[in-house]
């Protein structure tokens, strides 16, 4: 679905156990410009029904909040035609979140500015589309399964080498890697 045809609302579904998520919900639950809900099994004043990815992608804005570690919706949300709204990212995975640039790959939010950010992008859809395009370009490099496989082999080789589980000489290493790539 094209960005222009989506609902002018921010969406979030996820478990709300952590202090930072609770503070976010205290600030924004029940506001008209966002539909956020706690989908955990625990009793909660923020309880809402689960929404799958397809349902969430009907909204112009997808909120991505870290939980105990990385925000698990970040990758698929950045590959959608919705604008990702996220606080400063602190966790790092294979996706190299530390290289993501706020307001270039996603729109930076906090517990005070969500209204302003949403209003800005509703009024300036070209700004949103530019960030969405940048996000798509970033995600694209992770979609090449063959390349990701070879990078994984190289990472494992380095891990085994530096942990003392693999003894390599350069010629032997090159030969073995070339054999794997065939």
Residue ranges with predicted function:
Residues 1-52:
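Phosphate-/polyanion-interacting regions in eukaryotic proteins
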Residues 54-180:
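Catalytic binding pocket for nucleotide-activated donors in carbohydrate/polymer assembly enzymes
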């Amino acid at each position: 679905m094209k960005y222009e045809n989506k609902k002018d609302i921010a969406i979030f579904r996820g478990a709300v156990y952590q202090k930072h998520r609770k503070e976010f919900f205290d600030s924004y639950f029940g506001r008209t410009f966002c539909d956020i809900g706690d989908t955990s099994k625990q009793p909660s004043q923020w309880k809402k029904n689960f929404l799958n990815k397809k349902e969430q992608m009907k909204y112009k804005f997808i909120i991505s909040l870290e939980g105990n570690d990385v925000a698990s919706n970040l990758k698929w949300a950045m590959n959608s035609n919705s604008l990702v709204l996220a606080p400063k990212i602190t966790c790092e995975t294979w996706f190299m979140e530390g290289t993501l640039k706020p307001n270039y790959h996603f729109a930076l939010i906090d517990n005070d500015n969500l209204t302003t950010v949403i209003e800005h992008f509703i009024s300036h859809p070209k700004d949103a589309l530019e960030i969405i395009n940048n996000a798509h370009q970033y995600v694209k490099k992770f979609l090449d399964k063959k390349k990701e496989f070879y990078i994984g082999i190289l990472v494992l080789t380095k891990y085994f080498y530096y942990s003392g589980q693999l003894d390599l000489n350069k010629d032997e290493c090159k030969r073995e890697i070339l054999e794997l790539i065939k």
